[in-house]
Amino acid sequence: MPRKPRHRVPEILWRLFGNRARNLNDAIVDLIPNRNIQPEQCRCRGQGCLGCSSDKPAFLLRSDDPIHYRKLLHRCFVVLHEQTPPLLDFSPTSWWSQREIVERIIEMMQSGCDCQNVICARYDKYDQSSPILELLTSSSWEFLLKRVGHDVMVYLLQQTSIFLPLLGKKHQQVSGPPLCIKHKRTLSVHENKRKRDDNVQPPTKRQWLSSAVDDCPKDDSATITPIVGEDVDQHREKKTTKRSRIYLKRRRKQRKVNFKKVDCNAPCITPSTNGKVSTGNDEMNLHIGINGSLTDFVKQAKQVKRNKNFKFGLSETYSVIPPNHILKTLRPNCSDSKLLMNHIFGEVNVWSTTPSHGKGNCPSGSICLYHSLLKSLKNLIGKTKSSHLKMLLDKHCPVLLLQEDALKSGTTSQSSRRQKADKLPHGSSSSQTGKPKCPSVEERKLYCTNDQVVSFIWAICRYIVPESLLGTTHQMRVLRKNIAWFVSRRRNEKCTVNQFLHKVKPSDFPFFARKELCCMVNGHELQSESIRSTQQMLCTKWISWLFLEIVKKLVHFNFYATESQGGRLNIYYYRKRSWERLISKEISKALDGYVLVDDAEAESSRKKLSKFRFLPKANGVRMVLDFSSSSRSQSLRDTHAVLKDIQLKEPDVLGSSVFDHDDFYRNLCPYLIHLRSQSGELPPLYFVVADVFKAFDSVDQGKLLHVIQSFLKDEYILNRCRLVCCGKRSNWVNKILVSSDKNSNFSRFTSTVPYNALQSIVVDKGENHRVRKKDLMVWIGNMLKNNMLQLDKSFYVQIAGIPQGHRLSSLLCCFYYGHLERTLIYPFLEEASKDVSSKECSREEELIIPTSYKLLRFIDDYLFVSTSRDQASSFYHRLKHGFKDYNCFMNETKFCINFEDKEEHRCSSNRMFVGDNGVPFVRWTGLLINSRTFEVQVDYTRYLSGHISSTFSVAWQNKPVRNLRQKLCYFLVPKCHPILFDSNINSGEIVRLNIYQIFLLAAMKFHCYVYEVSRFWKLHPQTLFKFITISVRYMFRLINRRVRRINTGSSFRPVLKLYKEEVIWLGLDAYIQVLKKKNSRYRMLLIYLKSALSKHSLSQQLSSELRYATDRSNSSSLWKLNY
């Protein structure tokens, strides 16, 4: 028996309204009162209706009902408000049509001054039309009216809030009071899921915006065994309930208050104790958020976060420790050692009555823990003042020189190293320094490796920290591994202090295992259990302080941490001197198109300064502007909304532009269908791939303004709506602009919706926004010609090009090159097509297939395909000459053609990819296009430059093992495009090969994720097998959803010839082949996977398509990836 499908209420409606939000089918059934009457006594006179039916759901929805009616009942949701009166009367008949009912309800509400209902928005009395009216009068609603009657329909439209499905996970409100959020509330982790039990009361801390929602228990389906040191785990305090995150300004204010509290107890403690360095290094890329004092680290889950944006840092100083660090502000004496002890361990009751002595010795001559700590901390403060610390930085992380500077400084560096060989501090050896080295590297690889950074940090710890405070030899190895784990974290990853304490056992610190906590005074005695507990607490606090105040701040102060253009999520650590040398060399290239302005002009335009950062890449650095602060301006939103509206309504203005793979699919598929319809198979195809050289920087600003002015209308009217979004922890409202197109049956978003993957509700209150052409030209002109940036004390203004990273940059670039294509390229291609036809006719050859071509461009990447070799060759040479009027020239090194050029007598196929199976491919925007059959695959060669683990991040603070099930499904989403599965483009073998390759990459990511998580948790094979099978089954639903929901217009329909059993078999086989290389780690999991694969029905007799998909030679690039 097939499982009954679940029709769940969207999360956003469930959070706001709870059980009062239901789908239309359930809401109607609950509205009808239960009357035990015979059909002959009912108003229907025995004909049968919803009121007298014994099975109301079966009467409302029948097996022969149309699909659009079924979708309406299940995907439309209704909210019954608390004070709504019940339905008193029911009549199965209707005297009016659905349109007449909706029109009369709207006119009645408007005449009664009740225009707050969403159903009245944008209603035109003269035309008697509105977008919402059209939605509520479709054939599905007419069909529903015949089933429920007049009274139920009027009640639904007047007394309830109705939400219709819009696009993806979005819904649009079409009746009821406008949905709004008065207060933004943050939810705890366990509140994300719902529980349908009405008897359970929600917790008091969970306060919803409009109504309370029942709480739910945690999902403990994943069997997890934590791997933590027993001694530490037994004495850790329980976590407090997670509180809502307050705003940034209030958090900063709270830090100051916390600092004042700590400062009262320890006058010498500086602001650095709260984890914030005030020497200007707060602009460094590695931000570590620690709130509150360090003494209560166990109660608060402090998080270390890798920020997304990075800024330029200051120059290096002689010291490797921040000048306002607490160790730099104290002196190596007894009184300052006590201040440091209180700062690290807080107030210990046993030590409060301890007598103070000038030298910090025990009065009885014994050695207690208190006085031993004073001596050790005194040595720690003294070692911090040493001048040898800078030498450790130069030794372990040398300043890497550029190629032209290496020869000049080689002799000098050798002599200086010989002189300093005898002065190296602890951790150095003469054998390591016997061979002089000249740190010369390739020109762009100036960063320090993670091993070098870890080596430097550990050398500092070994030098300044007394050996007794680092524990045994085994414990030292544990600490170094934890430091290495922290340094290797990727961008956007957060980690807690408890993860720094992984495998740290107080029993391995003999220093803290002394029998006496302090000298016994006045007969003061403690029980052995209390002494042991206090000793373990002191050891744990010491290790936490070591990581937070030494390790974290050494990385923060001495390195410039940033991401790279090709490094994905990895973080690269630059010595500040190396970074300054790289920037000083590349700054002249990065400032092409900028001119220096005087201070007076800069002072007047100081508010228009642009934030920027340098992003390392393979051949230099890229200057990326950060316009996140200016994105809030209304003028920028209006300009973006108008340009987006033009893109939707007038796509011809943008020429051959495509904006994503789905857009490429919509343009490509009709062309291929047309070619195959002429002869039944594809003719020989000739490709030309080109890339515009400095596409953004070479744009002529005057020409661009003229192009924009040529197609702008005098005035634009946009609809202003609200988008109520639902996140994992909170709900919020975004203001959006929607195209005012009366001919459209659904709203088209003209402003970019930043959270389009989340569940949201569109609320239209009928507000309009008017934008004039004159204002648009002023705003665009200011964005182009008044873009000012500051470098050191100099100010520069951009006079050429478009700033990269701006919200409008991509659209403006497409409009610019679209005008070039309509003016120069399209006429040239038409002439070339005529010349080719005339040559064929002059040769008296029968023209079987007329010349056909297609030109596509993704921002600055051109793809041209033609059935004529001469036309492709002429277009190739035209691109090589460039377009001087538009200052547009192609990058000579990125041309790619699949034919031999007659003039050059060679095939320019340096960018062609040929796999182990011998099939040639053309690379274009992350895709591999078969140059013979035009079949499309994903280009996985871009992953060859790094490790697979650099492509994802781990949410350490949100129980990553529980998230593994969802993560495995997310691994499948990025490469799942309809163009890969449509049989109009790809054959059955390539469709299954694309699915198999997606599974291969997901399996590699699965191994990397499990390897990361297994450091702290033990994952059972049965749990992993369960997660894998869920993701494999999810793949088939994902493919069907993507292919079914893509909007292709009326030109063609996608064709999917695929079975669920084939997808499951491909997924299981892909995981087996990938995990076989890690057999020792996944021995039991492989047994489960092989057993499931052997029981599969397709394993008995494989089709030729499945054999082709699993052939290793067809996926040669994937098997070369490093995982």
From Swiss-Prot:
Domain Reverse transcriptase: 596-929
Subcellular location: Nucleus; Chromosome, Telomere
Region Disordered, annotated ranges: 191-242, 410-439
Biased composition (Polar residues): 201-210
Effect of a null allele: Low rates of telomere shortening at each generation. Null mutant plants can survive up to 10 generations before dying. Accelerated proliferation and cell death in dedifferentiated cells.
Protein name: Telomerase reverse transcriptase
Highest taxon in the source lineage: Eukaryota
Single Gene Ontology BP annotation: telomere maintenance
Quaternary structure and interacting proteins, as annotated: Component of the telomerase ribonucleoprotein complex. Interacts with POT1A.
Class in the EC hierarchy, top level: transferase
Main location: nucleus
